[in-house]
Amino acid sequence: MVRKKILNPDRVRRIKGGFSFIPHRFVTDGFMSSLNGSELLLYLFLVAVSDRYGLSFYSSTTICKLLEMTSGHYQKARQGLIEKDLIDFNGTVFQVLDLPASLGVHPAVGNLFEEV
């Protein structure tokens, strides 16, 4: 068993105010590797800004500005996350969803559509 030692005890993360998390399954079950760069950036942003129910209200204009993403890349990324069952969107509000039981798209397939 690996013994863990805190590298910098003065800078240990603590939960203060808002807090978000990404389940370990996001990495180990291949969800992360199924996303292209824009999808991953948008997903991480939505996780970081969402409330405890996974809801966020950022407009597409604000998201594109903050992520330095074109409207086209944003729309493709949003649609990709919806198709992979990671988020829901009603035109105004985003919801980051609990991870599905399995990937809807094989990890290698997601990377085929990455922007140039």
Regions found by a protein language model. Name each.
Residues 1-54:
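Short recognition helix of helix-turn-helix/winged-helix DNA-binding domains
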Residues 5-6, 11, 98, 108-111:
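Acidic/proline-rich low-complexity IDRs
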Residues 19-20, 28, 78, 93-96, ...:
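Short, structured secondary-structure boundary patches
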Residues 24, 33, 65, 76, ...:
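Charged/polar, solvent-exposed surface patches and flexible loops
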Residues 30, 34-35, 43, 64-66, ...:
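Residues in flexible loops and secondary-structure boundaries
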Residues 49-102:
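Winged helix-turn-helix DNA-binding recognition segment
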Residues 102-116:
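Short, amphipathic alpha-helical interaction segments positioned at domain boundaries
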